[in-house]
Amino acid sequence: MQTVWKFPLQIGGVWEVEMPSHAEILSLALQGDDLFFWARVETRNGVVRRRFLVVGTGHEIPHYAEKFLGTVHLKNGLVFHAFEI
């Protein structure tokens, strides 16, 4: 069955998230003060670990940052950018 699941991310640093294989990331946003992304998943697929990086504006983006996911603006004015690595 295909459905949309919500996954938490932390701001700053590299994070591993377990999710069904071949999940398609749809969007990234703040919900309250927390960062999440939403993905279309096939619930019958096996689980894999995927890695994500969240960096602030002006911080170095490593060469291995493969896919840009989106940008979020915090209430305090800071801006962060999420990548899959």
Which residue ranges define each predicted feature?
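N-terminal domain-onset segments
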Residues: M1-D34, T43, R51, E60-K67
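Extracellular interaction modules
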Residues: Q31-W38, G77
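Helix N-cap motif at beta-to-alpha junctions
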Residues: R40-G46
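Short, well-ordered beta-strand micro-motif
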Residues: W38-R40, E84
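Helix-rich interaction surfaces within compact, conserved domain-sized segments
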Residues: V47-I85
